[in-house]
Amino acid sequence: MTNIRKTHPIMKIINDSFIDLPTPSNISSWWNFGSLLGICLVIQIITGLFLAMHYTPDTMTAFSSVTHICRDVNYGWLIRYLHANGASMFFICLFLHVGRGLYYGSYMFTETWNIGVLLLFATMATAFMGYVLPWGQMSFWGATVITNLLSAIPYIGTDLVEWIWGGFSVDKATLTRFFAFHFILPFIIAAMAGVHLLFLHETGSNNPSGLLSDADKIPFHPYYTIKDTLGALALITVLSLLVLFSPDLLGDPDNYTPANPLNTPPHIKPEWYFLFAYAILRSIPNKLGGVLALVMSILVLALMPFLHTSKQRSMMFRPISQCLFWLLVADLLVLTWIGGQPVEHPFIIIGQVASILYFLLILVLMPLASIMENNLLKW
């Protein structure tokens, strides 16, 4: 009798995706982050669902309802901080996952990569709207500043902003719709992640060498299920340490002050995972230019397959490209630091230099380095 997992319509899909999936034998721990992102998404959906049971999306009671969750609901503090810090873990895994894709040339699977870029945008939108919900000072002013950026769009900008706000300022209507979108988007993300996997399994996984590995495949289970379990345990350990020992480490103290439209915080800044993009936005003195640079800082990822000039797929055997890649990583860390600093000398000029270097590295220097490496191989 044939095994049920190979015949049952639903079990067959699970089997072909997680059990009998032919996987390259040499993929490293950098390939763990896909499954870790799946775990993060599940954690976020479950904790978010329980938070939604006690939260009220109303300007008068939103802040109080979050306080009530932390003080009065059984383990409410745990659920709330798991959700808040779970978002940080989500973005850490996302950035490492994207970095892995850039380093090993995984972007050559164009469909998978483009769905991934859309997933990144969707996750960023979800996180932004989630940050508005507690209705603290940074929630309110963050929402005001970021939505206001759309007013830079010529002709329709102002109408668009007022349409998103549902009025003439960030108010009850804005909070209600942000809650609705924040609730529905993770399920859309889950569906998109399914499509992401579907496209990936059409081609099979890439591997560190960037070479075709069809001749050397092993089943996903038990080899990579056990490896992913180790990664999952590491993720849960770090998340637990964060939640139980320093839950406010990555948050902003201003968000413990209820939203007040009459009092602007001294430094308006988003959560740490948006600081690099925020620094790029602020480094351009023109509003529309800043918005375009902000969008392009992420959208430039979609250009990666077209900017690939090397004869080799992976950077494993390309030392010059490796140097530029790690320079890009360092540049992003500098941008993240600058995004959290006030707009004054010397931070302004550092931010501008780092922003120029970011686009220069991706659009010019890395493709040129690849051409140079191609020529070096002709000896």
Curated annotation (Swiss-Prot):
MF annotations from Gene Ontology: metal ion binding; ubiquinol-cytochrome-c reductase activity
GO cellular component assignments: mitochondrial inner membrane; respiratory chain complex III
CDD domains in the cross-refs: cytochrome_b_C, Cytochrome_b_N
Entry's cofactor comment: Binds 2 heme b groups non-covalently.
Keyword field contains Disulfide bond: no
GO BP annotations, alphabetical order: mitochondrial electron transport, ubiquinol to cytochrome c
Binding, heme b b562: 83, 182
Membrane topology, record value: Multi-pass membrane protein
Keyword annotations of the record: Electron transport, Heme, Iron, Membrane, Metal-binding, Mitochondrion, Mitochondrion inner membrane, Respiratory chain, Transmembrane, Transmembrane helix, Transport, Ubiquinone
A Pfam family the protein falls into: Cytochrome_B
Residues the entry annotates as binding a ubiquinone: 201
Compartments (UniProt record): Mitochondrion inner membrane
Subunit structure: The cytochrome bc1 complex contains 11 subunits: 3 respiratory subunits (MT-CYB, CYC1 and UQCRFS1), 2 core proteins (UQCRC1 and UQCRC2) and 6 low-molecular weight proteins (UQCRH/QCR6, UQCRB/QCR7, UQCRQ/QCR8, UQCR10/QCR9, UQCR11/QCR10 and a cleavage product of UQCRFS1). This cytochrome bc1 complex then forms a dimer.
Family: Belongs to the cytochrome b family.
PANTHER family: CYTOCHROME B
This protein's name: Cytochrome b
Organism of this sequence: Desmana moschata (Russian desman)
Gene that encodes it: MT-CYB
